[in-house]
Amino acid sequence: LAKFGDAEAAIRLIDEVGKGTHLGRILGNGAAFTARAFGIERAPVVKGQAMPAYDPRAIQGIGVTYATSTMGADHTAGYAIATNVLKVGGFVDPLKPEGQVELSRNLQIATAAIDSTGMCLFIAFAVLDQPETFQALLDLLNAFYGLSLTADSVADLGKTILRAEREFNIG
């Protein structure tokens, strides 16, 4: 279809998708579908979702997230880049397995809770680097929605959402 780095070929393939040609419809269905259509056994996908921005071989925390999240290869489901690379909220060595499971789990729980508020995931940076901002966030949500959220109830909310997503995926 195209050699690596061939920008003109890439644009032609995107045009195929836009035109809705047979090839374009295959490509437009994503990496997993395209691989199956062409008989390719190995494609950079997890749970049918194409590999996003970060390579899990170099950042093990994001690899754990890809493998365990309800969405597959979604770096925003548990943004381990924050702690593995940017050192936000601490540091877990991205090249060592120690601490990756706990990091990914905690970030997935927090992300599910944040997503449910309609706020951008990146508010987590402020909370991770300045823990006192977490209470300010709770105060804001409680005032806006008329709730009585606590740190524990937010964690429970994230866990409940992840359980519901898993049940949906199974059902």
What is the role of each PLM region?
Residues 2-171:
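Extended C-terminal regions of large enzymes
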